[in-house]
Swiss-Prot record:
Subunit note: Monomer.
Name by which UniProt lists this protein: Protein pelota homolog
Superkingdom to which the source organism belongs: Archaea
Main localization of the protein described in the UniProt heading: cytoplasm
MF terms (GO), sorted A to Z: endonuclease activity; metal ion binding
SMART domains referenced in this protein's UniProt entry, alphabetically: eRF1_1
Matching Pfam families: eRF1_1, eRF1_3
InterPro entries assigned: eFR1_2_sf (IPR042226), eRF1_1_Pelota (IPR005140), eRF1_3 (IPR005142), Pelota/DOM34_N (IPR038069), Pelota_arc (IPR023521), Ribosomal_eL30-like_sf (IPR029064), Transl-rel_pelota (IPR004405)
Length: 341
């Protein structure tokens, strides 16, 4: 994401969308009543005919839709300004925002929202995770919106079809090279339970740096192991998803011990945030996209309070491995600096 222009007085923020995570963040920050300006197309009647015409419109947002791991955000609303000759003011319209597009968002920006936009604009690292042994292959791409599984399949056994270990490793390396070409990661982590991963590594012909680690299996369980380890921070310090996994694990451990250094639920978390007790706040992303504006505003206010007092806020997307655990705890969990009871 690139911030092209920001007018603090009018609240107009012009952005250039560079990847799917940018779209996800825009989806999270948009609220009903915000104004967006973007290029779009619309069917316009021309006499007896109609054709799709490109134009720039100003839209008052009603709601937005984003499907994780897609390259399009749909913004629905009412046209407030458009070329007069098309007569579409006051009509419903949907802007399809894609990677590479520009958008102007006009709203009342809180410090927390602007900080999240700026933080996203500073991010640039992407890592590809490859879990493999001679029987299985899983390739994943951690993103702000969750873990995108690119492939998860069984490999032809070494004894099948006269396949040798070397030939299976070559097959895996070629597939990984295609993903590297497609997603341009800054680094690749190859992990697995045995020596097969080193054979794959030796056959890879790629520019990104390669890291190797051991896990118990080339499966989603192995992926969760990687996300909890320090190696992930070496190559993806900008991603919250691995840190969030470990922070939730810490919070659950404190709960199991009956510790007063962890609270969950809106009322308890809100109270802790107001007195500066929150060290780390975990929030499920659906609390920021609710149609219930009051709940959304209260959640954003809690996040603002935590950040203003030096606490960390981590947004946990639906595709995160820890989403359901956090959701079962109301979607809000705070690890505290000091006891408040």
């Amino acid at each position: 994401m690139k911030i092209l222009e920001y007018d603090e007085k009018t609240g107009a923020l012009r952005l250039h969308v560079e990847n799917e995570d940018d779209l996800w963040l825009i989806h999270l920050v948009l609220s009903k009543g915000d104004i967006v300006v973007a290029r779009t197309t619309r069917d316009v009647s021309m006499g007896n005919d109609s054709r799709r015409v490109p134009m720039v419109v100003e839209l008052e947002v009603e709601f937005s839709e984003f499907q994780p791991f897609t390259s399009r955000l749909r913004i629905h609303g009412i046209v407030r300004d458009a070329p007069e000759r098309y007569g579409i003011k006051g009509s419903h319209h949907t802007i399809n925002l894609d990677i590479g597009d520009e958008i102007v968002i006009i709203k009342k920006w809180t410090k927390g929202l602007i900080d999240r936009i700026r933080k996203q604009a500073e991010k640039n690292k992407r890592v590809l995770i490859v879990l493999t042994d001679q029987d299985e292959l899983l390739v994943a791409l951690p993103m702000e919106q969750g873990i995108r599984i690119l492939t998860e399949r069984s490999l032809p056994g070494v004894s099948d079809e006269d396949k040798s270990l070397e030939s299976v490793a070559l097959e895996v390396s070629k597939e990984v090279e295609q993903y590297v070409k497609q997603y341009s990661p800054d680094a690749v982590i190859i992990a697995g339970p045995g020596p097969f991963k080193e054979i794959v590594r030796d056959k890879l012909k790629i520019k990104p740096r390669i890291y190797v680690d051991n896990v118990s299996s080339a499966s989603r369980a192995g992926l969760n192991e990687i996300l909890r380890r320090d190696i992930i921070d070496e190559v993806m310090r900008d991603y919250q998803i691995s840190v969030a996994s470990r922070e939730l694990e810490r919070g659950l451990s404190l709960l199991a011990q009956g510790s007063s250094l962890v609270v969950y639920g809106r009322d308890e978390v809100e109270r802790a945030s107001q007195i500066g007790a929150v060290e780390t706040l975990l929030v499920t992303d659906d609390l920021l996209t609710l149609e219930d504006e009051e709940t959304r505003r209260k959640t954003e206010a809690i996040m603002e309070a935590v950040e203003s007092k030096g606490g960390k806020v981590m947004i946990v997307p639906k595709d995160s491995p820890v989403y359901l655990q956090l959701k079962n705890l109301t979607g809000l969990l705070a690890i505290l600096r000091f006891r408040i009871n």
